[in-house]
């Protein structure tokens, strides 16, 4: 019996005459595209630098957070140690740029509005502005690689260039332009790696260059601010997806996947970790002199700082009655037990002297250890302090005793209030505390620095603790001290830091100085705790994440007669939201359509299989020999630079990662925290614009692009005084030149 012949279904070839023509002359098209690309890139560079460097040295006074980061740059130049909640790279670069451009580190940067006068501040502004300006060319090239569309790349770059908010953030001595530069560089490198891999360029010099550049950018981003973790997550997810697709490529051996994993682990994990550690090594090596941030760190950490009382310290190892000591809370970032002449206000417990913790060195941190049942010891008698002893602690300056009673604490109402009580060291039975060494034994001597102590109130049986809560203005925003009836409170541990006693022999404490990795870990613990504990200052304008995408309220950078106001270009921000919504709608619609097509393809395969079962054939025939369209229903190309919707999806993920986490943060938040997410939204807008109009005739595409570009340039011209400076009446006054631009009542310019 003759074998039956199965006819191969023919598929109509698709493609317009225009497409056939473009395939016939790819070289001329590529040359034309290259020229267009270079012309557009040069235009982006010129317009970006022109808008960013215009009036970059104005105003000639401190604006907003320049008071912090300019001051920290000065401390790097002077090698003075300080505490900050952010990693060090951004501030080191600010200090380096100032040093290289003639700034000597002596300007105090006390408060916004202070005139720079003859200070060479310009170099630091130029540096930050240059990095901020480089974001736009990188954004242009990133979108072009994702879409191969000049229109999409140009529109995305224009959305970044003509946003007055991003312009304002780029022109000052701040961490934000540095952070945004490295973040954009990470995304740029991520796309370049994907492009090189897809074109078969794995393991080439170019591929390795982009791999290590991306790892460098990732390390630098998180070394400026911890929010750099969000772009690390984005690149990590993208890399994992690429590796998964490589694993699924049956044309490649499994060894290829393992090689790709190893290469990316080296360049995107190990290399960034090494760089990050190196930045901290430089930071801790440069800042080797004692400063006002010493008290946030442990006593052992401080012993490495030149000028600190513990540096090469020689003091008594043992603690004795009559010792004048400072007592530091042992938790990460803990302060010194402190008092001053001010009383607790009415409604905050007994109106007795305040007891707080304070993170700076001060004579008000000093206490005298006395026996619980005697006022004074004979001057020539030495009695060591031991585990389990009952003592009174007299404040050296105010002569009041550390005291607690059954009144509730001012902030933590479940705790008892701790006060300073008595006169000239004479008080009552509520001044008595039992000293316990954590893990101590009977008659064990209390040692300076190394002994971890608890102070248990004799009558109330509560533990002296630092709750970590910040007191209001009446407490000078210092930390609350209370007495916790739960004596297992982890914040109830203390140590003696400074110890003075003329009868005790002194020993060197250099043996307790920690090495680099111990200080590296402690620095992170202190930074993370400080970041989580950031609270708004009284009268300070803060914001919540829901306000940011809608441009609800801005933020003053300079509130003098020369006003600078951080606010997004409303045309750009609100149209960004429109394109964000369009992406979600188109993506969901496309997903539904893809699922329906996949179902049709599976049904077609089952039908073919049933036909073969009923009529056996000796010939295996593909579903379609002239085109793979039915097969592509099950397997479609996933290369972002050929799939605008796939590219937009990754930019949307970037927007989500840089926006949604702020909803869960309890710390104080500000409007400028949204700008990393804004960059992703602006890139997404360009990609979606291209995706929506690409099927239209070219002349209509050009009209739409020209109209949108004209609109955002015009809106930039209207709102540019917000960035370049305003004077005269505020916008809420009818005679103000900005009156007609106050589109929302919450805008305060």
Swiss-Prot record:
Domain MIR, first and last residues per copy: 316-372, 382-438, 443-499
Family matches, as InterPro entries: GlyclTrfase_39-like (IPR027005), Glyco_trans_39/83 (IPR003342), MIR_dom_sf (IPR036300), MIR_motif (IPR016093), PMT_4TMC (IPR032421)
Pathway field: Protein modification; protein glycosylation
Membrane-protein topology: Multi-pass membrane protein
Keyword Heme annotated: no
Reactions listed under catalytic activity: a di-trans,poly-cis-dolichyl beta-D-mannosyl phosphate + L-seryl-[protein] = 3-O-(alpha-D-mannosyl)-L-seryl-[protein] + a di-trans,poly-cis-dolichyl phosphate + H(+); a di-trans,poly-cis-dolichyl beta-D-mannosyl phosphate + L-threonyl-[protein] = 3-O-(alpha-D-mannosyl)-L-threonyl-[protein] + a di-trans,poly-cis-dolichyl phosphate + H(+)
Function statement: Rt/POMT1 and tw/POMT2 function as a protein O-mannosyltransferase in association with each other to generate and maintain normal muscle development.
Protein name in the entry: Protein O-mannosyl-transferase 2
Species this protein is from: Drosophila pseudoobscura pseudoobscura (Fruit fly)
Source organism phylogeny: Eukaryota, Metazoa, Ecdysozoa, Arthropoda, Hexapoda
